[in-house]
Amino acid sequence: MANNNNYKFETLQLHVGQEQPDPASDARAVPIYATTSYVFHNSQHAADRFGLADPGNIYGRLTNSTQGVFEDRIAALEGGVAGLAVASGAAAITYTIQALAKKGEHIVAQKTIYGGSVNLLEHTLPLYGIESTLVDVHKLDEVEAAIKENTKALYIETLGNPNSDIPDIEALAEIAHKHGLPLVIDNTFGTPYLIRPIEHGADIVVHSATKFIGGHGTTLGGVIVDGGTFDWAASGRYPWISEPNPSYHGVKFTEAAGAAAFATYIRAILLRDTGATISPFAAFLLLQGTETLSLRIERHVENTKKVIEYLLNNPKVEKVNHPSLPDHPDHALYERYFPNGGASIFTFQIKGGRKEAFEFIDNLEIFSLLANVADVKSLVIHPATTTHSQMTPEELEDAGIHENTIRLSIGTEHIDDIIADLEKGFAAVK
């Protein structure tokens, strides 16, 4: 669109990337471009594409026109300069870390994040020489003390998983930038409709598009958004981006791609070599979800408020962990960063232990017991024995996950039916 700043979120989510109908067919909907490769006009055109002088399609592992619309749209919604869609959220996170840190280098990360990200940082990446320190990001002194000479990024989530704890993004951005580091934020649970981390100092945003962006539990996908705010050339700490890269005939990505150097590096090198490519069909389905993102999020938030009120008044509930509550330690940050509400994925502690948690979960009907979240359908799981089961008892305690912790993902069903289903679960607890 001529100027994305002139349009509201609800308009951008429908139009960015396909301002005019498809030129080949006049189709209004974004077509699924089911092709592996693309015809070049002539030899010079092919050379320009491979040399990054012309940013168009080269090969399906790197780009696809359906994928391109999706990337442009999410980048616009986040306020970034470029997007890169990949096969899953895990791929988006992995590529981002691999693009920032190499063998012998280090990442500082929030400890209360998705269990899969903890495993990646603590177990998988160390096999490739990348170490991590997980910290309590509410203790800013602890964050700063964890930064070493070889630290390459600070990694956090807008809403922690599973307890929806909230970091002070602006304070952490200040620390990261003071040490010449980019701030990376996983905004999967926040969504750009509720919070745009780049506006608060983040440099790179990642998403599991499988969640709220897709919204319907049908499609895996991930997105990396380059904020275009970090000066890779001035930093001098990321030579594979700012200096001649021997893996791509000596190109300097900061010169070839300008503000979009980070996203371009991942596409041209990491995606090229390891191939976690999103399919055109997956990109199409995620675009369908994107077009209703604001409408769905409003309903998720509305329903969540009513579920929290119900749980607070239930005698079988020991504690509700939600940042909207005045006694939550992150309540002030919630009001500051989420003025329109949020955190439809949260936990509560049932009175008792694992037995009572299982009884409650196993007697729900509308809530589906599965590992996904952020679906239009309401979901439930027991984190300690599933999504976070690879963590040690000490790590679970640090993350605020107990035997009686239950995670809810509140969907868009009628609220009366959601509450009635929760009643069935509690009635089964002896």
What are these regions (language model features)?
Residues 2, 10, 122, 149, ...:
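PLP-dependent enzyme catalytic core of the Aspartate aminotransferase-like
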Residues 1-57:
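N-terminal glycine-rich, Lys/His-bearing helix-loop that initiates the first secondary-structure elements
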Residues 154, 222-224, 320, 346, ...:
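Well-ordered beta-strand positions enriched in small/hydrophobic/aromatic, beta-favoring residues
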Residues 42-91, 116-123:
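Conserved N-terminal alpha-helix of the aminotransferase class I/II PLP-enzyme fold
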Residues 2-4, 17, 21, 84-314:
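Conserved PLP-enzyme active-site core in the AAT-like
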Residues 18, 34-40, 228-229, 242, ...:
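Glycine-rich beta-alpha junction loops
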Residues 274-277, 281-283, 288, 292, ...:
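Conserved small-domain helix->loop->beta segment predominantly found in fold-type I
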